From Swiss-Prot:
GO terms for cellular component: extracellular region; membrane. Transmembrane segments: none annotated. Disulfide bonds join 42-352. Homotrimer. It is found in: Membrane. One of its GO terms (molecular function) is arylesterase activity. This is Serum paraoxonase/arylesterase 2. Belongs to the paraoxonase family. It comes from the Eukaryota. Ca(2+) 2 binds at residues 54, 116, 168.
Length: 354
């Protein structure tokens, strides 16, 4: 009787594991292939060889790149090189990516930047917020951008128990931001288990010097985040659920879900086209290729444009798609004055003139 019970429990456990594995493959879109959608007048950006996970562009055309991200279990083309912040002036005829100097006292050796966001104060001071993973921990760094010196002055490091696994950030004040946690746990093994079991425990946190709180939760894996041009709505990408959530922002900074847009791809970072309000999305057509790297069958890239996201039927178009022969693992796309920048999780970055 005991053996029969043990065998029954083992069978149930194996069936559950098999079901979870199949569900994970579906969430990763493990069988999906992408058809190429090419853009003319594109070239790879010199100096970006190991990823530009996030990009943010100021209204004056200065673009910031978060480069060199490293995560446990994730492929890296430069595993021993610290990350950094690069800048490109898109007003130049042939813009180049230049690394910004960082003020003394900041630990550059462990700099591991992830999501980034800029905020321009009423006195025109530019702040750069950077999600950082020094030694695979979680902090948010606030810098002041000093344009004349092409440098960043480090102002503050933020750590908080409600920020255990920060992915992306959108600044809404000089020390105020919304941030996504892509996992509930910070321990790598528990992160893998959480993803495998599909617990939907990830969230969005609002941070200010006076208040820190969870303002949205229940995501499979909350990832990219941005804000509408009128500052009334927050957009959140749920990468493994293939969704973009539109949330209304209230005066107390709480969020209320307004709608969910379902897509057929893994949605990463979100950018806003300042000329139209369209949402540009860096996507991973096949997540399994992204996380299990094979140079003979590399991860593909995909960029979507979403028009009228607040309407009942938003228009979704594919701006760019590549099977990995040019660009592997696109994570972000940002546009300025008919110039498109596409960054990747750990590969190169692309500059296109539209």
């Amino acid at each position: 009787m005991g053996r029969l019970l043990a065998l029954s429990l083992l069978g149930i456990a194996l069936a559950l594991l098999g079901e979870r594995l199949l569900a994970l493959r579906n969430r990763l879109k493990a069988s999906r292939e992408v058809e190429s959608v090419d853009l003319p007048n594109c070239h790879l950006i010199k100096g970006i060889e190991a990823g530009a996970e996030d990009i943010d562009i100021l209204p004056n055309g200065l673009a910031f790149f978060s480069v060199g991200l490293k995560c446990p279990g994730l492929h890296s083309f430069a595993p021993d090189k610290p990350g950094g912040i690069l800048m490109m002036d898109l007003n130049e005829e042939n813009p180049r990516a230049l690394e910004l100097r960082v003020s003394r006292g900041f630990n550059l050796a462990s700099f591991n930047p992830h999501g980034i966001s800029t905020f321009i104060d009423s006195d025109d001071t530019v702040y750069l917020f950077v999600v950082n993973h020094p030694e695979f921990k979680n902090t948010v760094e606030i810098f002041k951008f000093e344009e004349e010196e092409n440098s960043l002055l480090h102002l503050k490091t933020i750590k908080h128990e409600l920020l255990p696994s920060v992915n992306d950030i959108i600044a809404v004040g000089p020390e105020h931001f919304y941030a996504t946690n892509d996992h509930y746990f910070s321990d790598p093994f528990l992160k893998y288990l959480e993803t495998y079991l599909n617990l939907h425990w990830t969230n969005v946190v609002y941070y200010s010097p006076n208040e820190v709180k969870v303002v949205a939760e229940g995501f499979d894996s909350a990832n990219g985040i941005n804000i509408s041009p009128d500052k009334k709505y927050i957009y959140v990408a749920d990468i493994l659920a293939h969704e973009i959530h539109v949330l209304e922002k209230h005066p107390n900074m709480n969020l209320t879900q307004l709608k969910v847009l379902k897509l057929d791809t893994l949605v990463d970072n979100l950018s806003i086209d300042p000329s139209s309000g369209d949402v540009l999305v860096g996507c991973h057509p096949n997540g399994q290729k992204l996380f299990v790297y094979d140079p003979k069958n590399p991860p593909s890239s995909e960029v979507l444009r979403i028009q009228n996201i607040l309407s009942e039927k938003p228009t979704v178009t594919t701006v760019y798609a590549n099977n990995g022969s040019v660009l592997q693992g696109s994570s972000v796309a940002s546009v300025y004055d008919k110039k498109l920048l596409i960054g990747t999780l750990y590969h190169r970055a692309l500059y296109c003139e539209l």
